[in-house]
C-alpha cells in the first residue's frame, strides 16, 4: 500500500541508474519524487517537505551538503539519508553536523533502504 501523496519521499541523485534502483526498491510502497539536481531539490522542498529525503552529495547545482545546510538553516527537520560513493570523512562529518539520519555508501543495500523507509515514514 502506498503512503499518501501528502507524504512523498524525495530521492535526489543525478545518476539515472540510482533513481531507477530507488524506484525498484520503494516505488511499490511509497510515493517517490525523483530529483536530479540541487536547485530543484531546494525549490521542491520549499513547496512541500518530504517525509524522508535520500540525498547524494555529488549533484549539479548546489551539492548535497549545500542542500542539507539550506534545509537546516530554514528550520526544515526532514529526516535525511546521505547516499554517496564518496569516502572522505570530511563529508560525513559535515553531514553529521547537520543532523543526518544516516550516511550510507554506494552501492545500496536493498534491505537497509527499505528498513529506513519503514522506520522513518511509517
Q: PLM features: what roles do these ranges have?
A:
Residues 19, 34, 60, 88:
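The feature encodes the CheY-like receiver
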Residues 48-54, 59:
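Active-site beta3 strand of CheY-like receiver
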Residues 66, 87-102, 115:
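Alpha4 helix (beta4-alpha4-beta5 surface) of REC/receiver domains from two-component response regulators
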Amino acid at each position: 500500500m502506498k503512503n499518501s501523496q501528502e507524504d512523498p519521499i524525495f530521492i535526489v541523485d543525478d545518476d539515472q541508474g540510482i533513481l531507477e534502483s530507488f524506484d525498484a526498491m520503494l516505488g511499490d510502497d511509497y510515493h517517490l519524487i525523483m530529483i536530479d539536481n540541487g536547485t530543484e531539490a531546494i525549490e521542491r522542498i520549499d513547496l512541500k517537505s518530504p517525509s524522508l529525503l535520500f540525498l547524494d552529495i555529488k549533484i549539479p547545482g548546489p551539492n548535497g551538503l549545500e542542500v542539507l545546510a539550506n534545509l537546516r538553516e530554514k528550520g526544515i527537520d526532514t529526516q535525511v539519508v546521505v547516499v554517496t560513493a564518496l569516502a572522505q570523512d570530511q563529508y560525513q562529518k559535515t553531514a553529521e553536523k547537520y543532523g543526518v539520519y544516516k550516511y550510507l555508501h554506494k552501492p545500496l543495500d536493498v534491505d537497509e533502504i527499505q528498513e529506513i523507509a519503514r522506520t522513518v515514514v511509517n
